[in-house]
């Protein structure tokens, strides 16, 4: 019964929204199921289709809608120009003397003749004279062009061969020729926040009633690059979650670059032709399948970094400005837990991007794509929403407005946010205000909700930078302070509470975790697992492949044990037992060469049948003579220990002097256990006094 009441109340709420929409935004809305119905059979942009549907089907009377749909289909069939039929249509125009077409028209001013000329995209004709009334009335004709219904006439004059025989008799835009932003702001006042979110999501084709609040906000975040200039967004997640849909289908102002090779000339500036690339022509450039991004030019990523940071880039002798936002979407092939344990959430990027902290630091927002459900038919709406073109154009108009400083009235940002973090958070706050409250009217609580969301999206970037870049990005405890109460509130990311590489509780005897520098130069976690069998003193190592230095370090430990085993314990035998140790590089950074001390502890642990202390990370190394070696990059090593779940850290006394390089709150996270010799390290690791 309760389910029935809930369904009825949802239907009632939707009926209220539909009624308000028809009253406030008449002619600007369309029923989205009609779009789906016709789109399946017509290769015409969604925004053109929805404009026609808005003209003919803006009613709740099924008969009117049916007639309207038939009209739209007829208009598309008779008048839409397919590029492969352009010559046929020109021939029909010549025979009949007049013909009506649907095409994308761009108008240019010819300065030499002081006249306006039209260019037809699909029909492939240029320099067609057009009355100056049209570009004056419909300014979007001059800014990239719009789709129109055009009545053409054909009149060939023998005496005047220089004049075009094709004339424009009448032109009617079938995209919004002009968007009144004040009308939108006034219309927004008629709706609550929840109603407005539902309208926005239905306008991009989604059904909000099938999504929870968190999923709704994440889908709205995909619109941020369309509403903010120079906004850099990243979304990685499972397949079939619609990551690229909005940039390809919804906005005529964004372009989707499918993964693969691209060039600086195509993306930024063509030196030969002296023309600006995609970033100067579009509001948003989205890269699909980030794993495949590959610049033919060596300086491609450097120019991209420049553009992402400042909205400008230098090519040749001049600097070019570009307001385009950049979006990077791609697939994650493993579970988030596995990625968090073994690498970073930027793992799907190509190596030259995914490990470049300077590039990744320019990301303003990381949407957790794994939290968005895989889309099924019920996730797509059949209800009313804005005509896609109207949505895209008012979003474009809102790019001109700024709300980044709105949070200063009620809040200030915590100390852990540096300049880049602050810019990212302010951009997100401004963008979300434009989407949710275009009229600029919101409460302190509503602003706080946006601020928390923005801090989380940026912190996700910073957490991964900390993994890749160490102490340079240590400040990740993002917070905001209430100006009235002076209370500080901290914002975390949900996935950080996931499983750890170094587990809680006791390990099996012979199992040791060590943290040190791998082959790649990065610091990571390595696991040793041991076996002891009856035998004659053989020592076998697996997982080291043919790496001579790693094998040498392991042999150093076994030789040390043979020489000093009795000093550690009389029960350890290196003549009647065989030992096997498997070495694992848990984070894929290349095996460490500092294996002598961890190997010695693992051998003693399995030989004595005694596990190491719970949640222990072993740091440091010994030489063949048993001399202790200091820990390199101690602060970064301790940070990796913390991220990996270690609660106790075994350290050489020689590294005590370096603790001053690590922040006090980081050191406070551990029980530090110092050792003074190799034997002392074994005793303390096994918890023997």
Where are the language model's segments positioned?
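Extended, charged/polar low-complexity intrinsically disordered regions
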Residues: 2-203
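Dynamic helix-loop-helix/coil hinge segments at AAA+ ATPase domain boundaries and subdomain interfaces
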Residues: 183-217, 544-551, 630-633
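Short, basic, glycine/proline-bearing loop/turn elements
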Residues: 201-210, 258-259, 618-627
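Conserved ASCE/P-loop NTPase catalytic core
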Residues: 207-347, 361, 475-495
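Short glycine-/polar-rich loops that comprise or flank the Walker A/P-loop
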Residues: 231, 282, 322-325, 359-365, ...
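Phosphate-sensing "switch" segment of ASCE/P-loop ATPases
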Residues: 319-326, 331-436, 440
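C-terminal helical "lid" subdomain and adjoining coupling/linker elements of P-loop NTPases
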Residues: 375-379, 405-481, 486-504, 590
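Peripheral, non-AAA+ core regions of ATP-driven protein-machinery
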Residues: 497-689
């Amino acid at each position: 019964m309760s389910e029935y009441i809930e369904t009825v109340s949802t239907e009632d709420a939707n009926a209220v929204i539909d009624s308000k929409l028809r009253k406030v935004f008449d002619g600007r809305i369309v029923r989205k199921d009609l779009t789906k119905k016709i789109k399946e059979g017509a290769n015409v942009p969604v925004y053109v289709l929805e404009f026609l549907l808005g003209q003919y089907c803006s009613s709740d009377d099924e008969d009117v809608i049916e007639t309207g749909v038939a009209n739209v289909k007829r208009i598309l069939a008779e008048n839409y120009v397919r590029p492969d039929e352009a010559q046929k249509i020109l021939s029909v125009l010549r025979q009949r003397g007049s013909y009506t077409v649907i095409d994308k028209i761009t108008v240019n001013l010819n300065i030499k003749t002081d006249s306006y000329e039209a260019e037809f995209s699909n029909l492939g004709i240029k320099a067609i004279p057009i009355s100056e009334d049209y570009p004056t009335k419909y300014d979007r004709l001059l800014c990239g062009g719009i789709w129109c219904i055009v009545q053409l006439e054909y009149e060939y004059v023998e005496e005047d061969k220089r004049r075009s025989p094709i004339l424009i008799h009448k032109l009617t835009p079938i995209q919004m020729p002009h968007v009144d932003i004040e009308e939108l702001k006034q219309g927004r006042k008629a709706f609550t926040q929840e109603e407005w979110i539902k309208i926005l999501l239905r306008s991009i084709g989604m059904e909000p009633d099938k999504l929870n609040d968190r999923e709704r906000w994440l889908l709205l975040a995909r619109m941020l690059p369309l509403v903010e200039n120079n906004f850099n967004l990243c979304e990685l997640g499972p397949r079939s979650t619609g990551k690229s849909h909005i940039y390809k289908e919804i906005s005529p102002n964004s372009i989707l670059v499918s993964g693969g090779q691209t060039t600086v000339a195509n993306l930024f500036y063509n030196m030969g032709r002296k023309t600006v690339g995609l970033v100067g022509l579009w509001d948003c450039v989205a890269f699909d399948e980030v794993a495949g991004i590959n610049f033919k030019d060596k300086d491609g990523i450097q120019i991209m970094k420049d553009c992402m940071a400042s909205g400008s880039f230098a090519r040749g002798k001049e600097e070019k400005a570009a307001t385009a936002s950049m979006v990077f979407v791609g697939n994650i092939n493993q579970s988030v837990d596995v990625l968090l344990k073994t690498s970073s959430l930027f793992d799907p990027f190509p190596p030259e991007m995914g490990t470049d902290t300077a590039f990744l630091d320019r990301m303003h927002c990381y949407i957790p794509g794994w939290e968005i459900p895989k889309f099924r038919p019920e996730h797509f709406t059949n209800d009313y929403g804005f005509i896609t073109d109207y949505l895209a154009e008012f979003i474009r108009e809102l790019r001109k407005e700024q709300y980044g400083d709105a949070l200063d009235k009620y809040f200030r940002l915590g100390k852990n946010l540096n300049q880049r973090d602050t810019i990212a958070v302010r951009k997100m706050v401004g963008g979300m205000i434009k989407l949710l409250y275009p009229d600029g009217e919101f409460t302190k609580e509503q602003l706080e909700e946006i601020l928390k969301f923005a801090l989380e999206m940026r912190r996700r970037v910073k957490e991964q930078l900390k993994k890749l870049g160490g102490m340079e990005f240590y400040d990740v405890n993002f917070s905001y302070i209430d100006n009235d109460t002076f209370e500080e509130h901290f914002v975390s990311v949900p996935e950080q509470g996931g499983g750890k590489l170094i587990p809680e509780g006791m390990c099996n005897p012979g199992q040791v975790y060590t943290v040190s520098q791998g082959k790649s130069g990065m610091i990571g976690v390595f696991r040793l697992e041991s076996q002891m069998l009856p035998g004659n003193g053989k020592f076998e190592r697996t997982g080291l492949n043919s790496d001579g230095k790693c094998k040498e370090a392991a042999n150093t430990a076994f030789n040390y044990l043979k020489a000093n085993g009795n000093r550690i314990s009389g029960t350890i035998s290196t003549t009647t037992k065989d030992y096997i140790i498997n070495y694992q590089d848990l984070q894929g950074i290349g095996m460490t060469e500092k294996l002598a001390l961890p190997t010695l502890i693992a051998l003693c642990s399995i030989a004595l049948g005694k596990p190491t202390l719970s949640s222990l990370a072993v740091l440091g190394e010994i030489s063949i003579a048993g001399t202790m070696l200091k820990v390199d990059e101690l602060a970064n090593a301790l940070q990796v220990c913390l991220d990996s779940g270690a609660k106790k850290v075994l350290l050489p006394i020689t590294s005590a002097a370096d603790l001053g390089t690590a922040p006090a709150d980081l050191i406070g996270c551990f029980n530090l256990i110092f050792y003074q010799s190799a034997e002392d390290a074994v005793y303390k690791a096994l918890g023997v006094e």
